[in-house]
Amino acid sequence: MKPFTFYEAIESNKRKTWFIVFIIYFLLFFVCYAVVSYFELGEIGIIIAFLIVLFTNYYAYQKSNEIILNYSGVREPTREEYPYLLNVVEGLSIAAGIPTPKIYIMDDPSPNAFATGKDPQNSVVVVTKGLLDILNRTELEGVIAHEISHIKNYDVRLQTIAAVMVGLIVILGDGLKRSFYYSKRRRDKDENILGIVSLIIAILAPFLATLLRFALSRQREYMADASAAMLTRYPEGLASALEKIAKNFQPIKRANVMTAPLYIVNPLSSNAVSKLFSTHPPIEERIRRLRMMGERWKMLDKEG
């Protein structure tokens, strides 16, 4: 396979990301339409469904930072405690052209990190004590550049909205299934095409939406890797950091299925989990792509 540049990797992932987002919104519209049609709610039902989507997106957008940090049990470090960490974050933030995010430490031995925040002006980078214990400065720069790239690319906002959309699809789909099976109207709809179609949508849409959310998370990880490599101009730093993280991996106690997509590597035990259901790409593949970018960069330097 031909090595690719940072720019090619980023543009490819942008296209894939927006395609996935479009499909998730289409599925949500499809499920809302099925619910409205099945219960004969008419225009009022469509308006109500739209308002529900609008409100849940707004609430998640405003409160996601506070909820995630409180649940994760993080603390703010002093400059005397981790001066090099604060210096790295400040330097890379300036290079990325964003305000310096707040820094928090999670006292967990597992090496990991994540970023959160609705926009670059209200962003946070969290690193575990385990990460700081095993990485050298170059590797730490790669990890922090990855998290800053998530912030600059508005990935937290995107992931939050996607999670809300998928959650709504699951809730509406489940409600539609229950109504089909248990309501009195079932006897009148056994042979009704609309009822059968609604049931099929209720079964398939939540499953497909969940797969798409995982696919979206994987694409944003690839994009953050490429953006981090472009920011540091040294893909090997992040590649080496990922190798160390994988070697020293252990599950994070305070992580859950909702916060897992935020981390640089999946913080949960991944025993027998299919690639389709993974929130993160395989670490080996991420390392391979980063090193391919490094090779391409060296080739371009020689040609130039």
UniProtKB/Swiss-Prot annotation:
GO terms for cellular component: plasma membrane. Zn(2+) binds at residues 146, 150, 221. Belongs to the peptidase M48B family. Its cofactor is Zn(2+). It comes from Dictyoglomus turgidum (strain DSM 6724 / Z-1310). It is an enzyme of class 3 (hydrolase). Its main location: membrane. The chain crosses the membrane at residues 19-39, 41-61, 156-176, 192-212. This is Protease HtpX homolog. Keywords: Cell inner membrane, Cell membrane, Hydrolase, Membrane, Metal-binding, Metalloprotease, Protease, Transmembrane, Transmembrane helix, Zinc. Its EC number is 3.4.24.-.
